[in-house]
Amino acid sequence: RMKKIFAIGDIHGCYDRLKTLMGKIPIDYSRDTLVFIGDYIDRGPHPFEVVDYLIKLKNRFPDVIFLKGNHEDMLDKFLNGADRYTYLLNGGQQTLDSYLIKPVQADQSEFFPIPPEHMEFFKSLRLFYETEEFIFVHAGLRPRVPLESQNTEDLLWIRNKFVSSKYDFGKRVIFGHTPLKKPLVEPNKIGI
């Protein structure tokens, strides 16, 4: 049988839904590829459990691909003392609650107790993943800019300029980030 590629986007702390979805995917880890497109945390009720589950999956199946999303980017900035209010306004409080079990003030600078293996996971996330036919990325690509010249901010955050573009990127782009009622399937891209 042909090798398959499965892509999962924007879990946002929904651990139960992730487990249900993983139980339905007919994946053969020895042949197929599984790509997670970022945004594992924030908004949903169980970000800690989601990250824990993904780390265990990565330990069992090292070939699974994990991309960085804009929410992991916001967490990184939050932990480094930048853009704290932005993070809290974008669903970050759920992640903080999940790790801390107490509310956090945006101006608090005391150590945030993320387990080392979770920090390692966040640091290991890739910005994109490329195959012969596809480019997987969290948010999208800026039209008319070669992949190697793409700006990190665009890979994690771009929306309308990419989603509305008919530009041929040379390969079909598989992306998450932009909320869609159903998958967007176009010749140059698939939004999930």
Where are the regions that the model predicts?
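Short, well-ordered beta-to-alpha junction loops that form the rim of enzyme active sites
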Residues: 132-134, 139-141, 177-178
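Active-site environment of divalent metal-dependent phosphoester hydrolases
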Residues: 12-16, 42-45, 73-76, 143-144, ...
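Conserved beta-sheet core of the metallophosphoesterase superfamily
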Residues: 152-192
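Cytochrome P450 core scaffold surrounding the K-helix E-X-X-R motif
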Residues: 144-150
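Active-site neighborhood of divalent metal-dependent phosphoester bond hydrolases
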Residues: 43-126, 160-164
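Beta-strand-turn-beta hairpins that frame and shape the catalytic cleft
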Residues: 2-6, 129-135, 186-187
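Active-site neighborhood of phospho(di)ester-bond hydrolases with catalytic His/Asp-centered motifs
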Residues: 8-9, 35-38, 65-70, 172-178, ...
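N-terminal active-site segment of His-dependent metallophosphoesterases
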Residues: 1-53
